[in-house]
Amino acid sequence: VQYDNLDMLENSYGINLLPLAVFSTERYGDAHVFAPRKLPEEPFKPRDTELYSRMHKAISVIMYKLEGQLVHRRREYGMEDRDMMSRVNWGAGTINIDGTDYPLRDTDFPTVYPNDPTKLSEEEAALMEQLCAAFMHSEKLQAHARFLCSAGSLYLKRNGNLLFHGCVPCNRDGSFMEFEVGKAVTLSGKAYFDYADRLARQGLLAPEGSEEREEGRDYLWYLWCGRNSPVFGRDHIATFERALIEDKATWKEPKNHYYSYTDEEEFCRKILHSFGCDKPWSRIVNGHVPVKAKEGESPLKGHGRLVVIDGGFCRAYQSQTGIAGYTMFFNSLGMRLAAHEPFTSIEDAVKNGRDITSHTFNVDELSHRVMVADIDTGEEIQSRIDDLMKLLEAFRDGIIKVDQAKAKQR
């Protein structure tokens, strides 16, 4: 709702948002604080803004409540302080953050029980049942989720390069942060990525209603916005603060210490080595953080050992980045990046013959061409050759015997 993506939910995925619209209209009046962001080429009509604002407010309040329940249910996340609803003084209309009381920009919350602020009202619970059913029964959405499970991963090693979205969580000194995943069991670096990948799939594939499904489902939320999550890479997400607190000092989302070290080549090499990427051309291909190209920021970090290619295709970030994202190319000659200019509008494209314009530049030119034997395909072929040679050797040594009857039939 905030980014005007209702068409995607309703038309593409067939999810009925009428129950949310009806509920928000009946329960909320003025909701201008939750007005959706206006995109220049898609101006809203006044009545749309009012309805979308109410819908945004209604689902946001439900989200704040459910997040409060989750962080207490999963204390191992260490995020009880993100139960924002329980920190509000409902009588005074303020919230205490780090010892300071901040006034809320909106104090009209008719569905909140001050003595139990994370509890859903009966109507909210019924609405969530309807929405969950709609999401679960959307064939296209479920097909996309299955595709993510079968083809996706939390990280990817390809031809000596390491691709991941967020970060490898690190401590202040640059060492890998350790996460407790069981009694006396801690994981860090690649081992934690593997654990997180398995738990995320568990949230989508474990039997419905099982403890494993519930644990994995909660962990999917943690991956999205959890403290030092390898996908999120920040201390917390300030959704509540941005919506309801005027003071922008509370909007900060402190980044993990990983981002303090990405300009150091040795740090990047340490990560590559820990994931088994030790080719001369090996690089980290990172996402998540918008590159402010219009301010001269480079997508290359750590003397070229890390490449950031995120932050542009989302229109909400294009005002910050000045571009519409990057595309990376890697072939036998080296690596190139293409920086794309934002797509203005269909009208402009037709009238002026403008399309998405791209500018390419070299990241690295290799001193010698990469051969098939140097990449993943070559390693797979070599592995098959090695297996066949072992079979041949076993045959010549008499370990494998030929069935003469079958040999004659052939």
Residue ranges and their predicted role:
Residues 1-410:
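Feature recognizes metal-dependent phosphohydrolase scaffolds
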